C-alpha cells in the first residue's frame, strides 16, 4: 500500500518505512524463493516481477515512496495484480503478503472477490494491518513547512481477516515497529 495515509507517523519514521522494513526482513529470510513486488494505492502496478535476485528486490523496496500512482486504497486490485503474477507459477507454495493501513475505496475488483480469485489458483493471502488504534499524526504540508493533523486510523480488519480466511492465510496487526 503506497497511499498517502502510509505517511502517518504512528509507526516510526512512518507506516510506509515500517512496512518496507517488514518486506525487507521477509525477503532476507527467504533466500531461495521467487519474490515479486506489487504496489497499489488508487490503482496498481507490478514494481518487480517474480525473481530470485533479492538484491534487486531490496533496492526496489528501498526506493518505494508514496505518490507514485493515483491516491486511494484499491486492495482488491492489488491482490488481483499479484494473483496475475503468481497464478502460473509452478511453486508448491504461492503466497501474497498484503500490507495496508486502510479500507478499500478504489478499484474495479472488491477485496473479497480478489480473495476468491486467489483461492481458485491455490494462492494464500496473509494480510497485515499497519497502524495503531485511535488517532495517528499525519504530515500536512503548509508552504515550506509541515504541520501534523491527527487523523483517525481506519483499518478494515474485518475484510482483511476475511481475505486471509478465504485463502487459508492469516491476518496480523502491526501496531508498533516491533510487532
Predicted segments, located by residue:
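VWA/integrin I-like adhesion module and closely mimicked acidic/polar interface patches used
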Residues: 70, 84, 95, 102-166
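Membrane-embedded segments
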Residues: 2-94, 109
Amino acid at each position: 500500500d503506497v497511499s498517502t495515509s502510509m505517511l502517518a507517523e504512528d509507526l516510526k519514521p512512518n507506516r510506509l518505512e515500517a512496512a518496507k522494513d517488514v518486506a525487507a526482513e521477509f525477503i532476507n529470510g527467504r533466500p531461495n524463493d521467487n519474490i515479486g513486488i506489487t504496489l497499489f494505492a488508487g490503482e496498481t502496478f507490478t514494481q518487480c516481477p517474480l525473481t530470485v535476485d533479492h538484491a534487486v528486490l531490496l533496492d526496489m523496496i528501498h526506493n518505494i515512496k508514496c505518490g507514485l500512482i493515483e491516491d486511494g486504497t484499491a486492495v482488491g486490485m492489488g491482490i488481483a495484480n499479484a494473483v496475475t503474477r503468481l497464478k502460473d507459477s509452478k511453486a508448491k507454495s504461492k503466497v501474497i503478503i498484503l500490507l495496508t493501513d486502510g479500507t478499500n475505496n478504489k478499484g474495479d475488483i472488491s477485496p473479497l472477490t480478489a480473495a476468491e480469485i486467489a483461492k481458485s489458483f491455490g494462492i494464500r493471502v496473509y494480510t497485515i494491518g499497519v497502524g495503531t488504534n485511535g488517532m495517528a499524526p499525519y504530515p500536512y504540508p503548509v508552504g515550506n513547512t509541515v504541520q501534523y493533523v491527527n487523523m483517525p486510523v481506519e483499518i478494515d480488519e474485518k475484510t482483511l481477516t476475511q481475505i486471509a480466511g478465504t485463502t487459508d492465510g492469516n491476518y496480523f496487526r502491526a501496531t508498533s515497529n516491533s510487532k
